[in-house]
């Protein structure tokens, strides 16, 4: 999948504390320094823990945004803060926009300053490289030009663009009735969304394709077929008032003319669909999150599947897998669970990247997996949240929230962050708490029209 990045990353040996201070110097007499007890972790209540992890995750997009564009950096290394500091993640920036809306609503960041920043960000996107309306996967924050994601991936990326457009629509809906500056921001978001040529990315077929390059055309040849993280591209394509895709692209492309359905089960829980490459099992948990930051799966069904049940089952299966722990990794439990794409520990101890899932379990837990599943598994996700903040806060929480990944088995922690992993935490926890981002996205008139055109029904929203 597109998210399976070979980062060629170096080996991390030390966990860096963001709050460390120099030790006092000895007096030169050889007398041992006094021992200072480690600070005691004050346990947080459930509400306090949800507040804190949302505040912490917001920092990635507020304190560590790309300096020129104010959009989301692809990654942030606590030991190399300037590493690839100009690379903007298009999809991660969409998640970041929704994260900032949560921050405003909860009073964690100042509203007026956030509006100014988002206006800067959207004006940057307005002038950045676009390819038939779609943005590339990576953008240079200094110039707005495309940074190739791979040799032939130097053009439009319709999936990353869809993730961004979820954020644009949430911003539009949140600010459309605000003051003059806010209404201007909403109009800018609307213009950007309406400029995407979704139908171009069908290449005239009854399916959508991930990439198009002005140099290599359709050479990447990646057809979007379910089930994975790309459902939102089809929904937004059908919802577009300017460049809509045909309904047949959804039914034949995403749904594979019904072949998306699968009757297998794991741990007595129905898998429901064919997870790409998982042969009767489930894929990484980001598949249950990226398309659903804005699109509310509760009570949402099409001809083939109930997406509320599907996403909940996916999260429950991953939880049960970690509890069963068939590979006998030390540390897996009902409070330490969660498999998704993230940084990982390679066999030789270096840091790499992989899509963790039951069929690709390397003993690495990724915090965003359980945290961003709060709407589906609130009890199980709360156990993990309290484990993070009440038991492991000193080594697993850093300057922008939970570190990207850790392995209890190998006593390994990466002190790195990724936009696409931090960016789902605050919105999905907020969807669990108040449904804020779901309500904003689902109230967009064109989204409802698009969903209905594809045969979707929603008991939650009455259509």
Task: Give residue spans per PLM region.
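Ser/Thr/Asn(+Pro)-rich, low-complexity disordered segments
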Residues: 33-463
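Surface-exposed, charge/polar-rich loops and edge strands
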Residues: 10
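Bacterial Sec-dependent N-terminal signal peptides
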Residues: 3-4, 13-43
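Generic structural signal for short, solvent-exposed loop/turn connectors between secondary structure elements
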Residues: 2-3, 205
């Amino acid at each position: 999948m597109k998210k399976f990045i070979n980062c060629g990353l170096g080996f991390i040996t030390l966990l860096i504390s963001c709050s460390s201070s120099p030790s006092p110097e000895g007096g030169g007499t050889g007398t041992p320094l006094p021992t200072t007890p480690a600070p005691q972790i004050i346990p947080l209540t459930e509400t306090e823990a949800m507040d804190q992890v949302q505040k912490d995750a917001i920092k990635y997009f507020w304190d560590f945004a790309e300096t020129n564009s104010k959009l989301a950096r692809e990654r942030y290394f606590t030991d190399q803060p300037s590493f690839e500091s100009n690379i903007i993640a298009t999809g991660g920036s969409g998640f970041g926009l929704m994260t900032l809306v949560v921050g405003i609503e909860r009073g964690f960041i100042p509203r007026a300053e956030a509006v100014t920043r988002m206006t800067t960000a959207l004006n940057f996107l307005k002038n950045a490289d676009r390819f038939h309306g779609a943005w590339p996967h990576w953008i240079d924050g200094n110039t707005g030009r495309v940074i190739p994601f791979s040799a032939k991936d130097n053009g439009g990326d319709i999936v990353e663009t869809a993730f961004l457009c979820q954020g644009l629509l949430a911003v539009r809906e949140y600010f459309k009735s605000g003051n003059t500056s806010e209404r201007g921001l909403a109009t800018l978001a609307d213009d950007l969304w309406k400029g995407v040529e979704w139908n171009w990315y069908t290449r005239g077929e009854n399916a959508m394709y991930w990439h198009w390059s002005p140099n290599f055309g359709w050479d990447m040849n990646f057809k979007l077929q379910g089930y994975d993280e790309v459902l939102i591209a089809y929904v937004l394509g059908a919802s577009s008032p300017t460049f809509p895709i045909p309904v047949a692209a959804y039914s034949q492309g995403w749904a594979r003319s019904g072949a998306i359905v699968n009757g297998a089960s794991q741990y007595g829980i129905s898998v429901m669909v064919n997870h790409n490459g998982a042969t009767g099992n489930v894929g990484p948990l980001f598949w249950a999150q990226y398309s659903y930051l804005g699109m509310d799966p509760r009570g949402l069904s099409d001809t083939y599947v109930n997406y509320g049940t599907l996403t909940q089952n996916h999260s429950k299966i991953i939880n049960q897998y970690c509890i069963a722990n068939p590979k006998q990794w030390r540390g897996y439990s009902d409070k330490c669970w969660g498999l998704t794409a993230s940084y990982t520990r390679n066999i030789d101890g270096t840091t790499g990247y992989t899509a963790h899932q039951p069929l690709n379990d390397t003993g690495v837990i990724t915090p965003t997996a359980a945290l961003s599943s709060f709407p589906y598994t609130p009890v199980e996700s709360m156990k993990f949240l309290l484990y993070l903040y009440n038991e492991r806060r000193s080594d697993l929480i850093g300057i922008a929230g939970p570190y990207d990944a850790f392995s209890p088995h190998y006593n390994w922690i990466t002190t790195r962050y990724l936009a696409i992993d931090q960016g789902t935490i605050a919105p999905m926890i907020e969807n669990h708490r108040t449904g804020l981002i779901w309500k904003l996205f689902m109230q967009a008139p064109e989204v409802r029209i698009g969903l209905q055109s594809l045969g979707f029904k929603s008991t939650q929203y009455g259509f």
